[in-house]
Amino acid sequence: MSMLPSFGFTQEQVACVCEVLQQGGNLERLGRFLWSLPACDHLHKNESVLKAKAVVAFHRGNFRELYKILESHQFSPHNHPKLQQLWLKAHYIEAEKLRGRPLGAVGKYRVRRKFPLPRTIWDGEETSYCFKEKSRGVLREWYTHNPYPSPREKRELAEATGLTTTQVSNWFKNRRQRDRAAEAKERENSENNNTGANKQNQLSPLDGGKSLMSSSEDEFSPPQSPDQNSVLLLQGNMSHPGASAYSMTGLGAAQSVHGMQGHPHQLQDSLLGPLTSSLVDLGS
């Protein structure tokens, strides 16, 4: 462990200071500390120093410098989650400034597709919303048995998946909300289908039959009254001599008309027979 030239700290001590200042949130102080480091390539290539530089660049909004650091050095897997968050958040912020509005889930998805994680901070495994598929599989399996894990169980799941407890809690919360929304939609569709079926059942087939029968009955004279054609024939023959004889004959024929409505030929004979006889009498 040798001291750095013209500097009172060893490389390990510098790395420790960077980690402590990051964890304490003293990012401005961390930035001043990094600026005070001597120009030593070996020191500036230390992974803790590089990670500290990336954090400070993000904090100051210097995203171009952040991307350069993340793309130019191979980082250890245990640092990937933190650096991936910096990469994605920086691109989200730039996209929001460009569009002038916050990004939704779809907007963030498009940003991730447009700016994929560099292999220097990504092991190549497919991710979804920054969750590895293996981690999501563990959460899905747990959800099928218990959608409401306890705080202790959430901590255990976080350790098993490499996620934070907050990420685990948010995953279960979002999954429950999606399932409730799907169930509500299914109930709504079922109720709408039942309502439509009930309305159809309320329209009795007898109603339609009744209206058809009513219209049919209106086209015919009631059985107690003479047929309109017969009445007209009777009225026309009353003005001729011998009308009284015909009127009786016509009336008798009219009374039998309704019994023959189902037989058109019989109806025609019953009306024309008396009329022909009357015309013969009038002509003689």
UniProtKB/Swiss-Prot annotation:
CDD domains in the record: homeodomain
InterPro entries in the cross-refs: HD, Homeobox_CS, Homeodomain-like_sf, KN_HD, SIX1_SD
Region (Disordered): 167-238
GO BP: adenohypophysis development; apoptotic process; chordate pharyngeal muscle development; extraocular skeletal muscle development; inner ear development; peripheral nervous system neuron development; regulation of skeletal muscle cell proliferation; regulation of transcription by RNA polymerase II
Record bears the keyword Nucleus: yes
Location of the protein in the cell: Nucleus; Cytoplasm
Phenotype of gene-disrupted mutants: Morpholino knockdown of the protein increases both cell proliferation and apoptosis in the otocyst. Increases proliferation of neuronal cells and decreases the number of cells destined to form hair cells. Disrupts myogenesis by interfering with the proliferation of dermomyotomal cells expressing pax7 and loss of myog expression.
Biased composition (Polar residues): 191-204, 226-238
Protein family (similarity comment): Belongs to the SIX/Sine oculis homeobox family.
Protein name in the entry: Homeobox protein six1b
